Amino acid sequence: FLMANEAVDDMLEFHWIIDMLQMVDVGIVVLDREFKIKMWNGFMESHSGKLPSEVRDKTLFSIFPDIKPDWFAQKAKPVFELKTRAFMLWEQRPYLFKFSNYRPITGSEEFMYQNIILSPLVSASGKVEHISMMIYDMTDIASGKKQLEALQVMQSEALERGA
């Protein structure tokens, strides 16, 4: 009887975790070695307009043709082979997924700036057959940095003019 209660508790905990993954304000995508999409959370659904059922088992590149397969495979290679994380920062590449900026009132940016982390998902056998992508919205930070840089330019121009 005690084992049955533990099993029920484990099932409930599993459902809570899945629920959190769906609702968190971060994009989560799980890819296999062929870059087929295995998981697509609510953040990705709401920003891409694509349901999990539409993208599951399709390659990332068939859903997002702007993503260059060779470039992405090069980024993912050490994640699969060395079990290390890889990073794509908005300062180097503003976005991977061209999502609209969903804060059009407060933001002047037309698209969402993103930081992306690729992480290995180690299976029970110890091999990495899947990787996760975590997509963070960096638009507010990017916009703030751009505004600060513009102010610094204006300030230095004013100083040069002797104002």
Model region roles, listed by residue range:
Residues 81-129:
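Per-ARNT-Sim (PAS) sensory domains and their PAS-associated C-terminal
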Residues 8-47, 161:
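Sensory modules in modular signal-transduction proteins
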Residues 54-73, 81:
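PAS-family sensory/regulatory domains
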Residues 120-161:
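Sensory coupling linkers of modular signal transduction proteins
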Residues 2-16, 150-153, 157-163:
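Short, charged amphipathic alpha-helical "coupling" segments at sensory-output junctions
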